[in-house]
Amino acid sequence: MIEFGNFYQLIAKNHLSHWLETLPAQIAAWQREQQHGLFKQWSNAVEFLPEITPWRLDLLHSVTAESETPLSEGQLKRIDTLLRNLMPWRKGPFSLYGVDIDTEWRSDWKWDRVLPHLSDLTGRTILDVGCGSGYHLWRMIGAGAHLAVGIDPTQLFLCQFEAVRKLLGNDQRAHLLPLGIEQLPALKAFDTVFSMGVLYHRRSPLEHLWQLKDQLVNEGELVLETLVVDGDENTVLVPGDRYAQMRNVYFIPSAPALKKWLEKCGFVDVRIADVCVTTTEEQRRTEWMVTESLADFLDPNDRSKTVEGYPAPQRAVLIARKP
């Protein structure tokens, strides 16, 4: 059974305590009414994993846990089997005592692009919106964050996160809540807020930017990573039924247009930190994610286009400050 009591106890003692006015009731309602049909199967996989405290833990350069003496073949097989019960694994990679989870996305590459542009994370309280399996939460802790909180309504991601946490010695510096950003009150409590790979899924992208702003303390930093297209500050792609086979893609602005949106929402010191094309080396099918991936979503005769004829995915990182 996945519980949230440790998180409630933690925030009761800090500047997030006002969240307790709404959060426990929301989680209780989720537990009663909204659990996925496979949630019990997934949470059982977490429950059956052994609790291991790493002898060596590296969250600075990767998410890697090692034991002082190698685990037995039987222990490794048990861990491997239980983690495979939580497939597909999309965000990673993770190296856990000799079990290497080769995820669909090389999320470490994204982190390497983002990290040099961030304010120092040491001692910060961080929110990661749409955090997936929580890979970047652990990297934030590795970079010195005091507390990293992720929100993502996808329940498989919650179970993947809790599985990794259990294998990292039940580390309580990072937490994942099965909520969407629209369920959060205006907490105004986080030093840094990340939204990576979310904006293009929002029907109202400016509303999403306002929601992110409402979570930041004054002088807090927003890190926004999303799909973009080439163009000037007035360029926005509005795809038809699908974009790269995804149905729920609504608006893909140019990076200059996105900068303008952020300024319109009251952010300052907005800068475009990075723009890069997504490659089939960064997003691909693996034995831990066996269905279609980026290579299947691109035009086989022109890899600069999606199968629908739109520009192939490229992603930008923008950094902004809430005054």
From Swiss-Prot:
SUPFAM superfamilies: S-adenosyl-L-methionine-dependent methyltransferases. InterPro entries: CmoB, Mo5U34_MeTrfas-like, SAM-dependent_MTases_sf. Gene3D superfamilies: Vaccinia Virus protein VP39. GO terms for molecular function: methyltransferase activity; transferase activity, transferring alkyl or aryl (other than methyl) groups. It comes from the Bacteria. Pfam families: Methyltransf_9. Keywords: Transferase, tRNA processing. Its EC number is 2.5.1.-. Carboxy-S-adenosyl-L-methionine binds at residues 91, 105, 110, 130, 152-154, 181-182, 196, 200, 315. CDD domains: AdoMet_MTases. It catalyses: carboxy-S-adenosyl-L-methionine + 5-hydroxyuridine(34) in tRNA = 5-carboxymethoxyuridine(34) in tRNA + S-adenosyl-L-homocysteine + H(+). The keyword tRNA processing applies. One of its GO terms (biological process) is tRNA wobble uridine modification. Homotetramer. Belongs to the class I-like SAM-binding methyltransferase superfamily. CmoB family. Catalyzes carboxymethyl transfer from carboxy-S-adenosyl-L-methionine (Cx-SAM) to 5-hydroxyuridine (ho5U) to form 5-carboxymethoxyuridine (cmo5U) at position 34 in tRNAs. This is tRNA U34 carboxymethyltransferase. It comes from Salmonella typhi.
